[in-house]
């Protein structure tokens, strides 16, 4: 599965800006985030153009579908999931 190009992050720019400000988070490349030197979040573009985030949890990678454009409800759910997984680690 291909990495998602950065130009497809425009509708989640506010979420990514918040994540960048969290302690211990480093953006190694566009849309590739590490938490304390370990992979935490990256994005894929599936066949047909479906966008998906992979969030690293305690038990492994958790897929999170992010349709474009993302709804406000889905954006809040994504941010909530990121906060939960960040606290786990």
Which sequence ranges carry the predicted segments?
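Charge-dense, helix-prone N-terminal extensions
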Residues: 1-89
């Amino acid at each position: 599965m291909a990495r998602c190009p950065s130009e497809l992050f425009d509708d989640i720019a506010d979420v990514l800006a918040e994540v960048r400000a969290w302690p211990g988070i480093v953006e190694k490349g566009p849309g590739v985030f590490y938490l304390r030197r370990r992979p935490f979040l990256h994005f894929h573009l599936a066949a047909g153009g479906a966008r998906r985030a992979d969030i690293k949890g305690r038990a492994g990678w958790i897929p999170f579908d992010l349709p474009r454009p993302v709804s406000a409800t889905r954006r809040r759910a994504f941010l909530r999931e990121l906060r939960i997984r960040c606290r786990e680690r």
